[in-house]
Amino acid sequence: MNGKLSVTRARFFSRLFLTVLLSVCVFAPTVARCADFGPGLPVEIRSGCGDSTKPVVLGVEGKGWLERRAGNLVLHVAGTPYEMGYQHGVLLRPQIQSLVLRLYAAGTAQGLLDPKNQPLAKVQEAYKRCLPYISKDIQEELRGLSDGSSVSLEQIRTTNMIPELFHCSGFALFGRATKGGTLYHGRILDYAMELGYHNFACLIVARPEGKNAFINVGYTGFVGSVTGTNDKQVTFGEMGGGGVGQWDGMPMAFLMRKGLEEAKSLEDGLRIFGDTPRTCEYYYVISDAKIPDARGLATRPDKFLVLKPGEPHPDLPAPVGVLDAVLMSGDQRFQLLAARVIQDYGKFDGPAGLRLMRRPVAMKSCIHAALFAPALGRFWIANAIGSTPASECTYTEYDAKELFEAKSPK
Protein backbone atom coordinates (compact mmCIF):
# COMPACT_ATOMS: atom_id res chain seq x y z
CA MET A 1 0.00 0.00 0.00
CA ASN A 2 2.76 2.41 -1.04
CA GLY A 3 4.54 1.94 2.26
CA LYS A 4 1.59 3.23 4.27
CA LEU A 5 0.53 1.56 7.49
CA SER A 6 -2.31 -0.88 6.87
CA VAL A 7 -5.03 -0.40 9.49
CA THR A 8 -8.42 -2.12 9.50
CA ARG A 9 -11.08 0.28 8.31
CA ALA A 10 -14.07 -0.19 10.54
CA ARG A 11 -16.54 1.66 12.67
CA PHE A 12 -14.70 3.49 15.42
CA PHE A 13 -14.61 6.44 17.76
CA SER A 14 -18.08 5.78 19.19
CA ARG A 15 -16.49 6.25 22.55
CA LEU A 16 -14.18 8.99 21.34
CA PHE A 17 -16.18 11.72 23.02
CA LEU A 18 -14.46 14.06 25.42
CA THR A 19 -16.27 13.99 28.72
CA VAL A 20 -15.07 17.36 29.97
CA LEU A 21 -12.35 19.83 29.03
CA LEU A 22 -11.71 22.34 31.77
CA SER A 23 -9.94 25.53 30.77
CA VAL A 24 -8.68 27.73 33.56
CA CYS A 25 -7.22 31.22 33.56
CA VAL A 26 -5.78 32.25 36.91
CA PHE A 27 -3.74 35.39 37.60
CA ALA A 28 -1.17 34.48 40.36
CA PRO A 29 2.21 32.52 40.94
CA THR A 30 3.69 28.81 40.91
CA VAL A 31 3.30 24.97 40.73
CA ALA A 32 1.84 21.51 41.18
CA ARG A 33 1.32 17.84 41.93
CA CYS A 34 -1.60 16.05 43.54
CA ALA A 35 -1.91 13.04 45.79
CA ASP A 36 -5.31 12.32 47.31
CA PHE A 37 -8.43 14.08 46.09
CA GLY A 38 -9.16 17.52 47.44
CA PRO A 39 -7.83 21.07 47.17
CA GLY A 40 -6.15 21.39 50.56
CA LEU A 41 -3.12 19.16 50.06
CA PRO A 42 0.34 20.49 49.15
CA VAL A 43 1.48 20.41 45.56
CA GLU A 44 4.76 19.17 44.08
CA ILE A 45 6.67 19.69 40.83
CA ARG A 46 9.75 18.37 39.12
CA SER A 47 11.89 20.48 36.84
CA GLY A 48 12.04 20.04 33.10
CA CYS A 49 14.16 23.17 32.73
CA GLY A 50 17.62 22.98 31.22
CA ASP A 51 19.35 24.48 34.27
CA SER A 52 18.47 21.42 36.37
CA THR A 53 17.60 18.64 33.90
CA LYS A 54 19.68 18.06 30.80
CA PRO A 55 17.41 17.16 27.86
CA VAL A 56 18.25 13.92 26.08
CA VAL A 57 18.07 14.18 22.28
CA LEU A 58 16.31 11.15 20.78
CA GLY A 59 16.41 12.11 17.12
CA VAL A 60 16.89 14.90 14.58
CA GLU A 61 15.05 15.44 11.30
CA GLY A 62 15.72 18.58 9.28
CA LYS A 63 15.00 21.60 11.46
CA GLY A 64 13.15 19.47 13.99
CA TRP A 65 14.21 17.24 16.83
CA LEU A 66 12.76 15.05 19.56
CA GLU A 67 14.03 15.16 23.12
CA ARG A 68 13.13 13.81 26.53
CA ARG A 69 12.92 16.19 29.48
CA ALA A 70 12.26 14.88 32.99
CA GLY A 71 10.86 11.72 31.43
CA ASN A 72 8.51 13.55 29.03
CA LEU A 73 8.65 13.75 25.23
CA VAL A 74 9.20 17.22 23.79
CA LEU A 75 8.97 17.61 20.01
CA HIS A 76 10.47 20.65 18.26
CA VAL A 77 9.25 21.36 14.72
CA ALA A 78 10.09 24.29 12.46
CA GLY A 79 9.82 25.50 8.88
CA THR A 80 7.12 25.18 6.26
CA PRO A 81 3.86 23.35 7.05
CA TYR A 82 4.97 20.26 5.12
CA GLU A 83 8.38 20.29 6.82
CA MET A 84 6.84 20.50 10.28
CA GLY A 85 4.45 17.66 9.53
CA TYR A 86 7.22 15.52 8.08
CA GLN A 87 9.50 16.14 11.07
CA HIS A 88 6.65 15.20 13.41
CA GLY A 89 5.92 12.03 11.43
CA VAL A 90 9.51 10.80 11.16
CA LEU A 91 10.51 11.51 14.75
CA LEU A 92 7.38 9.95 16.26
CA ARG A 93 6.61 7.33 13.61
CA PRO A 94 6.30 4.29 15.94
CA GLN A 95 4.09 6.17 18.40
CA ILE A 96 1.81 7.54 15.66
CA GLN A 97 1.38 4.13 14.07
CA SER A 98 0.67 2.55 17.44
CA LEU A 99 -1.92 5.17 18.39
CA VAL A 100 -3.74 4.88 15.06
CA LEU A 101 -3.85 1.10 15.41
CA ARG A 102 -5.17 1.43 18.94
CA LEU A 103 -7.93 3.84 17.93
CA TYR A 104 -9.06 1.75 15.00
CA ALA A 105 -9.03 -1.43 17.09
CA ALA A 106 -11.12 0.24 19.79
CA GLY A 107 -13.56 1.48 17.18
CA THR A 108 -13.83 -1.92 15.56
CA ALA A 109 -14.69 -3.54 18.88
CA GLN A 110 -17.28 -0.89 19.68
CA GLY A 111 -18.79 -1.21 16.21
CA LEU A 112 -19.29 -4.93 16.74
CA LEU A 113 -21.13 -4.19 19.98
CA ASP A 114 -23.28 -1.48 18.39
CA PRO A 115 -23.69 -2.10 14.63
CA LYS A 116 -26.04 0.89 14.24
CA ASN A 117 -23.30 3.27 15.29
CA GLN A 118 -20.97 4.34 12.48
CA PRO A 119 -18.63 6.89 14.05
CA LEU A 120 -15.98 6.46 11.35
CA ALA A 121 -18.46 7.56 8.71
CA LYS A 122 -19.44 10.54 10.86
CA VAL A 123 -15.84 11.67 11.30
CA GLN A 124 -15.13 11.27 7.59
CA GLU A 125 -18.26 13.26 6.78
CA ALA A 126 -17.09 15.97 9.18
CA TYR A 127 -13.74 16.21 7.39
CA LYS A 128 -15.35 16.45 3.94
CA ARG A 129 -17.67 19.23 5.06
CA CYS A 130 -14.90 21.08 6.89
CA LEU A 131 -12.40 20.70 4.04
CA PRO A 132 -13.27 23.99 2.25
CA TYR A 133 -12.50 25.80 5.52
CA ILE A 134 -9.27 23.97 6.41
CA SER A 135 -6.28 26.08 5.42
CA LYS A 136 -3.80 24.91 2.80
CA ASP A 137 -1.11 25.09 5.48
CA ILE A 138 -2.93 22.58 7.70
CA GLN A 139 -3.57 20.31 4.71
CA GLU A 140 0.12 20.44 3.81
CA GLU A 141 1.15 19.69 7.39
CA LEU A 142 -1.19 16.68 7.45
CA ARG A 143 0.35 15.48 4.18
CA GLY A 144 3.83 15.84 5.65
CA LEU A 145 2.71 13.98 8.77
CA SER A 146 1.37 11.14 6.63
CA ASP A 147 4.54 10.89 4.55
CA GLY A 148 6.80 11.04 7.59
CA SER A 149 4.87 8.52 9.69
CA SER A 150 3.96 6.09 6.86
CA VAL A 151 0.31 6.27 7.93
CA SER A 152 -2.24 6.83 5.17
CA LEU A 153 -3.37 10.41 4.63
CA GLU A 154 -7.00 9.38 5.08
CA GLN A 155 -6.23 7.92 8.51
CA ILE A 156 -4.22 10.99 9.51
CA ARG A 157 -7.08 13.27 8.45
CA THR A 158 -9.65 11.16 10.26
CA THR A 159 -7.80 11.00 13.56
CA ASN A 160 -7.18 14.75 13.43
CA MET A 161 -10.95 15.32 13.29
CA ILE A 162 -11.55 13.70 16.69
CA PRO A 163 -11.68 17.06 18.54
CA GLU A 164 -14.87 17.91 16.63
CA LEU A 165 -16.58 15.43 18.95
CA PHE A 166 -15.13 16.93 22.15
CA HIS A 167 -17.17 18.40 24.99
CA CYS A 168 -15.64 20.68 27.60
CA SER A 169 -15.93 23.31 30.37
CA GLY A 170 -13.78 26.22 31.56
CA PHE A 171 -13.18 29.38 33.62
CA ALA A 172 -10.89 32.38 34.03
CA LEU A 173 -9.86 34.38 37.10
CA PHE A 174 -7.78 37.56 37.20
CA GLY A 175 -7.30 41.01 38.67
CA ARG A 176 -8.94 41.31 42.07
CA ALA A 177 -9.49 37.55 42.19
CA THR A 178 -5.76 36.81 42.41
CA LYS A 179 -2.58 37.73 44.23
CA GLY A 180 0.13 39.68 42.47
CA GLY A 181 -1.70 40.12 39.16
CA THR A 182 0.33 37.52 37.25
CA LEU A 183 -1.74 35.73 34.60
CA TYR A 184 -2.09 31.96 34.93
CA HIS A 185 -4.03 30.05 32.32
CA GLY A 186 -4.74 26.40 33.01
CA ARG A 187 -6.45 23.44 31.40
CA ILE A 188 -7.83 20.09 32.50
CA LEU A 189 -8.49 17.56 29.76
CA ASP A 190 -10.87 14.78 30.81
CA TYR A 191 -11.20 12.03 28.26
CA ALA A 192 -11.80 8.31 27.68
CA MET A 193 -8.74 7.14 29.61
CA GLU A 194 -9.16 3.54 28.48
CA LEU A 195 -8.15 4.60 24.96
CA GLY A 196 -4.69 5.35 26.30
CA TYR A 197 -4.13 8.82 24.84
CA HIS A 198 -2.04 9.74 27.87
CA ASN A 199 0.47 7.08 26.82
CA PHE A 200 1.10 9.16 23.68
CA ALA A 201 1.41 12.59 25.31
CA CYS A 202 3.87 14.96 23.68
CA LEU A 203 4.68 18.60 24.28
CA ILE A 204 5.11 20.28 20.89
CA VAL A 205 7.17 23.44 20.40
CA ALA A 206 6.40 24.81 16.92
CA ARG A 207 8.17 27.56 14.99
CA PRO A 208 6.20 27.97 11.75
CA GLU A 209 7.69 30.22 9.09
CA GLY A 210 6.30 33.76 9.27
CA LYS A 211 4.01 33.05 12.25
CA ASN A 212 4.07 33.02 16.04
CA ALA A 213 6.03 30.31 17.78
CA PHE A 214 3.74 28.36 20.08
CA ILE A 215 3.62 25.54 22.61
CA ASN A 216 0.97 22.86 22.16
CA VAL A 217 0.13 20.39 24.93
CA GLY A 218 -0.87 17.54 22.67
CA TYR A 219 -0.46 14.00 21.46
CA THR A 220 1.54 12.24 18.78
CA GLY A 221 0.01 12.52 15.34
CA PHE A 222 -2.18 15.56 16.04
CA VAL A 223 -1.51 18.99 14.52
CA GLY A 224 -4.48 20.88 15.97
CA SER A 225 -4.58 22.27 19.49
CA VAL A 226 -6.85 21.99 22.51
CA THR A 227 -4.36 23.45 25.01
CA GLY A 228 -1.69 25.98 24.12
CA THR A 229 0.08 29.32 24.45
CA ASN A 230 2.26 31.38 22.11
CA ASP A 231 5.35 33.56 22.31
CA LYS A 232 3.13 36.68 22.46
CA GLN A 233 1.71 35.48 25.83
CA VAL A 234 -1.73 34.76 24.37
CA THR A 235 -3.31 31.53 25.63
CA PHE A 236 -6.38 29.66 24.40
CA GLY A 237 -8.88 27.24 25.93
CA GLU A 238 -12.32 25.96 24.95
CA MET A 239 -15.41 24.07 26.05
CA GLY A 240 -17.88 22.25 23.84
CA GLY A 241 -21.63 22.66 23.74
CA GLY A 242 -24.14 21.16 21.34
CA GLY A 243 -24.41 21.45 17.59
CA VAL A 244 -22.70 18.18 16.67
CA GLY A 245 -23.12 17.84 12.91
CA GLN A 246 -22.78 21.57 12.18
CA TRP A 247 -19.47 21.00 10.44
CA ASP A 248 -19.48 23.65 7.72
CA GLY A 249 -16.59 25.67 9.11
CA MET A 250 -13.05 25.43 10.43
CA PRO A 251 -12.66 22.55 12.92
CA MET A 252 -12.27 23.71 16.50
CA ALA A 253 -8.74 22.34 17.00
CA PHE A 254 -7.54 24.01 13.80
CA LEU A 255 -9.18 27.30 14.83
CA MET A 256 -7.34 27.09 18.15
CA ARG A 257 -4.14 26.44 16.20
CA LYS A 258 -4.85 29.47 13.98
CA GLY A 259 -5.22 31.62 17.08
CA LEU A 260 -1.91 30.41 18.48
CA GLU A 261 -0.10 31.08 15.19
CA GLU A 262 -1.59 34.49 14.44
CA ALA A 263 -2.81 36.29 17.57
CA LYS A 264 -0.42 38.82 19.06
CA SER A 265 -2.97 40.16 21.55
CA LEU A 266 -6.35 39.45 23.11
CA GLU A 267 -7.92 41.74 20.51
CA ASP A 268 -6.30 39.72 17.71
CA GLY A 269 -7.67 36.52 19.19
CA LEU A 270 -11.21 37.88 19.34
CA ARG A 271 -10.99 39.09 15.75
CA ILE A 272 -9.64 35.77 14.44
CA PHE A 273 -12.34 33.75 16.17
CA GLY A 274 -15.04 36.19 15.10
CA ASP A 275 -14.03 36.37 11.43
CA THR A 276 -13.40 32.64 10.85
CA PRO A 277 -16.31 30.34 9.89
CA ARG A 278 -16.86 28.03 12.88
CA THR A 279 -18.35 24.60 13.54
CA CYS A 280 -20.82 23.33 16.14
CA GLU A 281 -21.28 25.14 19.45
CA TYR A 282 -18.19 26.07 21.44
CA TYR A 283 -17.27 28.35 24.29
CA TYR A 284 -13.74 29.72 24.38
CA VAL A 285 -11.50 31.42 26.92
CA ILE A 286 -8.79 33.66 25.49
CA SER A 287 -6.28 35.41 27.76
CA ASP A 288 -3.44 37.87 27.25
CA ALA A 289 -0.84 37.94 30.02
CA LYS A 290 0.58 41.27 28.82
CA ILE A 291 -2.50 43.20 29.96
CA PRO A 292 -3.56 40.97 31.85
CA ASP A 293 -7.15 40.25 30.80
CA ALA A 294 -9.39 37.52 29.40
CA ARG A 295 -12.65 37.07 27.55
CA GLY A 296 -15.13 34.27 27.16
CA LEU A 297 -16.72 33.52 23.80
CA ALA A 298 -20.04 31.81 23.15
CA THR A 299 -20.12 30.70 19.52
CA ARG A 300 -22.07 28.76 16.95
CA PRO A 301 -21.70 28.94 13.17
CA ASP A 302 -24.28 31.75 13.20
CA LYS A 303 -23.47 33.35 16.56
CA PHE A 304 -20.49 35.10 18.13
CA LEU A 305 -20.93 36.55 21.62
CA VAL A 306 -18.08 38.08 23.62
CA LEU A 307 -18.46 37.69 27.38
CA LYS A 308 -16.64 40.10 29.65
CA PRO A 309 -15.54 38.94 33.09
CA GLY A 310 -18.57 38.30 35.29
CA GLU A 311 -21.10 38.43 32.46
CA PRO A 312 -23.70 35.64 32.49
CA HIS A 313 -24.88 33.52 29.58
CA PRO A 314 -28.25 31.71 29.41
CA ASP A 315 -26.59 28.41 28.47
CA LEU A 316 -24.09 28.58 31.33
CA PRO A 317 -24.61 28.43 35.11
CA ALA A 318 -25.12 31.70 36.93
CA PRO A 319 -21.92 33.59 37.74
CA VAL A 320 -20.60 33.31 41.27
CA GLY A 321 -21.19 36.96 42.01
CA VAL A 322 -17.54 37.96 42.16
CA LEU A 323 -15.62 40.44 40.04
CA ASP A 324 -12.96 39.53 37.48
CA ALA A 325 -14.25 36.03 36.82
CA VAL A 326 -15.19 34.13 33.67
CA LEU A 327 -16.61 30.73 34.61
CA MET A 328 -17.64 28.18 32.00
CA SER A 329 -18.66 24.82 33.39
CA GLY A 330 -21.75 22.92 34.44
CA ASP A 331 -23.46 20.70 36.95
CA GLN A 332 -21.82 19.94 40.28
CA ARG A 333 -18.34 20.75 38.98
CA PHE A 334 -19.37 24.35 38.47
CA GLN A 335 -20.70 24.58 42.01
CA LEU A 336 -17.42 23.22 43.35
CA LEU A 337 -15.40 25.59 41.17
CA ALA A 338 -17.44 28.52 42.41
CA ALA A 339 -16.98 27.49 46.03
CA ARG A 340 -13.22 27.15 45.59
CA VAL A 341 -13.02 30.53 43.82
CA ILE A 342 -14.94 32.24 46.61
CA GLN A 343 -12.82 30.55 49.27
CA ASP A 344 -9.51 31.83 47.85
CA TYR A 345 -10.80 34.97 46.16
CA GLY A 346 -8.12 37.63 46.12
CA LYS A 347 -5.45 35.16 47.25
CA PHE A 348 -4.91 33.04 44.16
CA ASP A 349 -1.34 32.09 43.39
CA GLY A 350 0.11 29.16 41.47
CA PRO A 351 -0.46 26.44 44.08
CA ALA A 352 -4.00 27.71 44.71
CA GLY A 353 -4.69 27.67 40.98
CA LEU A 354 -3.48 24.09 40.71
CA ARG A 355 -5.51 23.00 43.72
CA LEU A 356 -8.52 24.54 42.03
CA MET A 357 -8.20 21.94 39.27
CA ARG A 358 -8.08 18.87 41.50
CA ARG A 359 -10.63 16.11 41.79
CA PRO A 360 -13.56 16.20 41.69
CA VAL A 361 -13.38 19.35 39.54
CA ALA A 362 -11.21 17.18 37.32
CA MET A 363 -12.85 13.89 36.52
CA LYS A 364 -11.38 10.43 37.02
CA SER A 365 -10.70 10.43 33.28
CA CYS A 366 -8.39 13.48 33.42
CA ILE A 367 -5.57 12.76 30.96
CA HIS A 368 -3.71 16.06 31.14
CA ALA A 369 -3.67 19.18 33.27
CA ALA A 370 -1.76 22.36 32.49
CA LEU A 371 -1.08 25.74 34.06
CA PHE A 372 0.58 28.56 32.11
CA ALA A 373 2.25 31.68 33.53
CA PRO A 374 3.24 33.42 30.27
CA ALA A 375 4.46 36.64 31.89
CA LEU A 376 6.84 34.60 34.05
CA GLY A 377 7.89 32.41 31.14
CA ARG A 378 6.88 29.27 33.04
CA PHE A 379 4.28 26.56 32.71
CA TRP A 380 3.46 23.23 34.34
CA ILE A 381 2.11 20.04 32.76
CA ALA A 382 0.89 16.76 34.22
CA ASN A 383 -0.21 13.69 32.28
CA ALA A 384 -2.18 10.75 33.60
CA ILE A 385 -0.18 7.68 34.60
CA GLY A 386 -1.96 4.35 34.27
CA SER A 387 -5.41 4.88 35.75
CA THR A 388 -4.32 7.81 37.94
CA PRO A 389 -5.85 11.11 36.78
CA ALA A 390 -3.37 13.75 35.64
CA SER A 391 -4.69 16.16 38.26
CA GLU A 392 -3.39 13.77 40.92
CA CYS A 393 0.06 13.27 39.33
CA THR A 394 3.35 15.15 39.50
CA TYR A 395 3.63 18.25 37.34
CA THR A 396 6.71 19.08 35.28
CA GLU A 397 7.80 22.72 35.20
CA TYR A 398 9.10 24.11 31.90
CA ASP A 399 10.84 27.34 30.95
CA ALA A 400 8.89 28.68 27.96
CA LYS A 401 11.62 31.11 26.93
CA GLU A 402 14.19 28.32 26.96
CA LEU A 403 11.97 26.16 24.75
CA PHE A 404 11.17 28.98 22.32
CA GLU A 405 14.86 29.88 21.97
CA ALA A 406 16.20 26.31 21.79
CA LYS A 407 18.54 25.54 18.89
CA SER A 408 18.63 22.32 16.90
CA PRO A 409 21.33 19.94 18.19
CA LYS A 410 22.21 19.04 14.59
What do these predicted regions represent?
Residues 15-29:
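Bacterial N-terminal signal peptides
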Residues 32-34:
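Boundary at the C-terminal end of the N-terminal hydrophobic targeting segment
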Residues 13-15, 19, 161, 191, ...:
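General helical structural elements
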Residues 36-146, 177-184, 188-410:
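C-terminal, well-structured catalytic/ligand-binding subdomain of enzymes
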Residues 145-187:
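Gly/Pro-rich turn-and-neighbor structural signature
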Residues 1-13:
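N-terminal secretory signal peptides that target proteins for export/translocation
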